[in-house]
């Protein structure tokens, strides 16, 4: 996980460290965001669980999420049949990490919000669009080619996939459903 929201980082760290034999490592990235990584405590991994592997890793493996790269991520199929309240929790966690709330500048002086989730995984973005439909929200999927500069040379990046919610009705419905933390919550309140 990487984030600039200290409360979200603290919450993630607390949840990981509830698993025996697990700790977290924090790094500051060039962007100023922090990266928090789950890892085992040396020498205690198998002993803690009577020779069995850590339950956190078992859950990650069970749902096919182990060792996934950003462009390989998706929502496990069984999650689509979760109750609506759990879908809202999942969407909230996804928006806390890679979602955004923007306010459009409008000539009328009103600044209506729109919400966006962005990833290099088309499958993940389409899965999120599907989850949004479960809570009565319609999102639009678009893509954009990205680029970056490395040692003064402009290079082509991966395609970025986005699901955007812009209709006032759906924005209101989604904001009412999400339980956001950190700077995303502050932006929602100020909007």
Residue positions per predicted region:
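Internal intein/HINT superfamily modules and their associated LAGLIDADG
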Residues: 1-191
